[in-house]
């Protein structure tokens, strides 16, 4: 088992613990963040395999969520909050690059995407889910570029659906 496979195995264990109620969403996010940051692998410059692209997705998603969480700290200086939000947005853009790389590697085959029903007013009509059936992979994005590509490839369903992981995406952290 290589380092990426070990990460995804450990991540699945965290998901299972979260699903059983053994940890909160915040605890799950923190443990996943620690796994990508302190693991023996970092982001890949050359995403030449689906595995590497999906790891980069997880890596940058974890960093983006952590920066966003830090930005909500009470009594933090406005400039510092803004810096953390900018970092969060930067990491989300890197995550979207990894998403596009993965979709292109798959040539959009076995991919289905749609907007998800979400409680957040800010994300309603923006957040969509990408399901890669054969791999059992669920990705999320708000990227208009990715949305455009999914539509052009004919894999985006113009409807809002309940997310495959509805409890997770609609739970605050």
Say what each PLM segment does.
Residues 23, 28, 129-132, 137-139:
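Short linear proline/tyrosine/threonine-rich motifs used for host-factor recruitment
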Residues 26-32, 77-96:
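Short, charged, amphipathic alpha-helical segments
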Residues 168-173:
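Short acidic DE-rich linear segments
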Residues 11-14, 57-71, 98-99:
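Non-transmembrane amphipathic alpha-helical segments
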Residues 39-58:
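Short, charge/polar-rich alpha-helical segments
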Residues 17-27, 69-82:
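Charged, low-complexity interaction regions
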Residues 3-30:
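Short terminal alpha-helical segments
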């Amino acid at each position: 088992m290589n380092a990426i496979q070990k990460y995804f195995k450990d991540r699945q264990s965290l998901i299972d613990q979260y699903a059983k109620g053994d940890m909160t969403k915040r605890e799950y996010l923190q443990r996943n963040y620690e796994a990508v940051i302190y693991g023996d692998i970092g982001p890949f410059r050359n995403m030449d395999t689906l595995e590497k692209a999906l790891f980069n997705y997880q890596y940058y998603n974890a960093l983006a969520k952590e920066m966003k969480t830090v930005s909500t700290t009470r009594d933090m200086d406005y400039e510092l909050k803004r810096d953390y939000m900018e970092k969060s947005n930067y990491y989300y853009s890197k995550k979207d690059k990894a998403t596009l790389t993965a979709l292109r590697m798959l040539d959009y085959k076995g991919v289905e995407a749609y907007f998800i029903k979400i409680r957040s007013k800010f994300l309603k009509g923006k957040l969509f889910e990408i399901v890669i059936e054969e791999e059992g992979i669920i990705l999320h994005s708000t990227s208009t570029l990715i949305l455009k590509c999914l539509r052009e490839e004919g894999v985006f369903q113009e409807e809002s659906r309940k997310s495959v992981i509805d409890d997770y995406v609609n739970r605050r952290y």
